[in-house]
Design a protein with these regions (language model features):
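Bacterial N-terminal signal peptides that target proteins for export
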Residues: 1-9
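C-terminal low-complexity, Ser/Thr- and acidic/Pro-rich disordered "stalk" regions positioned immediately N-terminal
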Residues: 193-223, 255
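Sec-dependent signal peptide cleavage junction
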Residues: 19-30, 218-226, 244-247
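C-terminal membrane-anchoring or membrane-association module
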Residues: 235-255
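Acidic Gly/Asp/Thr-rich repetitive segments characteristic of extracellular carbohydrate-active
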Residues: 27-53
Length: 255
């Protein structure tokens, strides 16, 4: 009887210990459906993952200033505010409007479309990993700016993996998918673990970014040639040594 009671008490204690952790896990993810809910979730440090429950329209730049994951869940964030002093809806009027800005922190952004701004995403002295499909179409000046604003000492760092797909149907030389402004000290583009240092005023279309991706998947470098030659030399050396030992053994046999 005592053993049975002890068993039940142990089960209850385990359940009580697990309960708070279950509660924390449940509260760390929030689904948002409008601009105000999104801003509120970004201000709540207990929320580690923000999921878009539907497409969201914004009238201001949305700032990410703490570590967080934003899961677009296949939805769109669209800036529908105005540009310039004339309150124009023309996003080719430069007003420094980005649909989303990640400022001096680390964040993960996945499966989202960012459209309607001067730029889709500003990585301002931050480190951002992009996952899934990131659609940057429909922005007036381009997709992603790797910037370093006034007073920001850290450089922008964007991470792409083999699970990242960039989409930009309005990509062009004048509206690149990725760029570094001239007032920056440079930035880092990381693709599948390989890091590339980008210089101020460098701009990259979608095809040029894809060229980086291809080079990391199929590197045609001098290192490969050296490795090939080294391998051939090793094989030749082993064969020569084996031939020498065999010849010596036959010579000793006849002697």
């Amino acid at each position: 009887m005592l053993k049975k009671c002890t068993k039940y008490i142990s089960m209850i204690l385990i359940a009580l210990c697990l309960f708070p952790w279950i509660q924390v896990e449940a509260s760390s993810t929030m689904t948002v459906r409008n601009q105000e809910e999104l801003k509120s979730a970004l201000e709540n440090s207990n929320i580690s993952t923000i999921v878009l429950g539907n497409d969201i329209e914004t009238t201001e730049k949305i700032n990410v200033m703490r570590p967080v994951t934003i899961d677009g869940n296949g939805h769109t964030m669209q800036y529908v505010g105005t540009f310039g002093d004339s309150d124009s809806s023309d996003n080719t009027i430069w007003s420094g409007i980005y649909v989303l800005q990640v400022y001096k922190t680390e964040a993960t952004i996945r499966n989202i479309a960012l459209t309607g701004g001067n730029g889709g995403l500003l990585i301002n002295g931050a480190k951002v990993q992009l996952e899934g499909t990131i659609d940057l179409s429909g922005n007036g000046f381009g997709g992603i700016e790797l910037g370093q604003g006034s007073g920001v000492e850290s450089i922008a760092h964007v991470i792409l993996t083999d699970q990242t797909t960039l989409v930009n149907r309005t990509d062009s030389e004048d509206r690149p998918t990725l760029w570094v402004p001239k007032d920056s000290t440079g930035s880092i583009l990381e693709i599948n673990g390989a890091q590339y240092e980008l210089l101020p005023e460098e701009e990259f279309t979608l095809n040029e970014i894809e060229a980086f991706t291809i080079s990391t998947e199929n590197p045609e470098t001098g290192d490969q040639i050296i490795l090939y030659i080294s391998g051939m030399f090793l094989c030749f050396s082993v064969a020569l040594f084996a031939f020498y030992k065999l010849s010596k053994r036959e010579k000793d046999y006849f002697l």
